[in-house]
Regions:
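A short, Lys/Arg-rich alpha-helix, primarily the initiator
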Residues: 1-17
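Short alpha-helical DNA-recognition segment
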Residues: 18-37
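DNA major-groove recognition helix of helix-turn-helix/homeodomain DNA-binding modules
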Residues: 46-63
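"A position-specific structural signal for the A-helix of alpha-solenoid helical repeats
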Residues: 69-73, 102-109, 113, 128-136, ...
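Amphipathic alpha-helical segments of tetratricopeptide repeats
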Residues: 89-95, 122, 151-153, 178-189
Length: 191
């Protein structure tokens, strides 16, 4: 099942939000030890098991949502079209994206769109791609790591001293001021 790891995390969050035990949720579906592995991303359940667990929690899995790649490209390039792209591709589908393989993408893009720049909870990190983790580190103010990870996945040009213009362009004024002074001396960016 595509996005099975993130499905396990979403199952765990929904189960804990309802204050359900693992044994109670998985009764008649799978063993509690197997559910534990699913929730940790250590086991890839069949689509049927995932669907049964999600259904019991009242959630509907969207297995093949429309790609959010245009939003990622607009965000990472610093394009002024990012807001319009987000409003077209993410906003109308927030509910279905929240229970899909693109749940982390939708939350990270929302953090930049809403200009709140709030990082995802740390429990999401083992399930993030390199690109997602690079943005997560930027949201956490861990700029050097964000640049290193972003360079590895070609999110932006490699720089040992400062992030690229695309990353800087997405920052709110408060986060921009948190950056090390040397990074804020990027040509064309007022300090």
């Amino acid at each position: 099942m595509k996005g099975g790891g993130i499905a396990g995390l979403l199952i765990r969050q929904a189960r804990l939000g309802r204050d359900w035990s693992q044994a109670g949720l998985c009764r008649g579906i799978c063993a509690p030890s197997y559910l534990s592995k699913i929730e940790q991303g250590k086991a890839a359940p069949s689509p049927e098991v995932t669907e049964l667990l999600l259904r019991r929690l009242g959630l509907v899995w969207t297995s093949e949502p429309e790609s959010l790649e245009p939003c990622w490209k607009a965000l990472l390039s610093g394009s002024p079209d990012f807001a319009a792209c987000y409003e077209r591709l993410v906003q109308p589908r927030q509910e279905s994206l929240a229970c899909s393989p693109l749940a982390a993408d939708a939350l990270l893009l929302a953090a930049f769109y809403e200009d709140e720049l709030r990082p995802l909870p740390e429990e999401w990190e083992p399930f993030l791609s390199t690109r997602q983790l690079a943005l997560q580190r930027g949201l956490q103010g861990r700029w050097e790591e964000a640049v290193r990870l972003g360079s590895r996945c070609r999110c932006w040009p490699r720089s040992a001293e400062r992030p690229s213009m695309s990353m800087v362009n997405t920052l709110s004024p408060s986060r921009y001021c948190e950056m090390p002074a040397a990074w804020r001396q990027t040509p064309g960016i007022p300090t």
